[in-house]
């Protein structure tokens, strides 16, 4: 959790401000971990994506969605809230840091659309 990472980092760490690059390289590792049921799973703790990396990546998804939307289709994005908030910021054409101001709860949906030529949030956190 964010609190655990902050504690390991020395008491202060905020994903939106510090990003994954601020974390210690010693936390990066590749190996296998054992789940409570005994199953062994591969684990790769890498540097992660920066906010700008995700912001660029979601543009690719938007680029694929827009032609479908323009031809009358609906498009469904399923992802973690963090990514969906960044996608929304990109959709609106605002700074990616704006995404931290968008609350998106677990198992909720939002609708992004176009209204009078502008990309808008039609519904949020429903």
Residue ranges and their predicted role:
Residues 81-85, 115:
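GST superfamily/GST-like fold recognition
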Residues 1-57, 123:
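Phosphate-handling substructures
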Residues 1-7, 52, 67, 71-73, ...:
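Acidic, low-complexity terminal tails and accessory targeting/binding regions
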Residues 73-82:
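Generic beta-sheet signal
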Residues 42, 46, 75, 100:
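Conserved short-loop catalytic and cofactor-binding motifs
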Residues 60-68:
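A generic secondary-structure signal
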Residues 63, 85-86:
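Alpha-helical elements of the RecA-like P-loop NTPase motor core of helicases
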């Amino acid at each position: 959790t964010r609190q655990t990472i902050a504690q390991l980092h020395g008491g202060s760490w905020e994903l939106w401000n510090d990003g994954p690059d601020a974390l210690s390289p010693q936390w990066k590792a590749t190996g296998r971990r054992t789940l409570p049921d005994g199953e062994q799973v591969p684990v790769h703790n890498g540097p992660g994506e920066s906010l700008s990396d995700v912001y660029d990546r979601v543009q690719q998804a938007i680029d694929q969605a827009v032609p479908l939307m323009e031809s009358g289709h609906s498009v469904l994005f399923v992802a973690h809230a963090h990514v969906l908030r960044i996608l929304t910021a990109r959709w609106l054409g605002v700074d990616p840091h704006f995404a931290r101001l968008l609350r998106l709860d677990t198992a909720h949906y939002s609708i992004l659309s176009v209204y009078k030529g502008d990309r808008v949030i039609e519904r949020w956190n429903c």
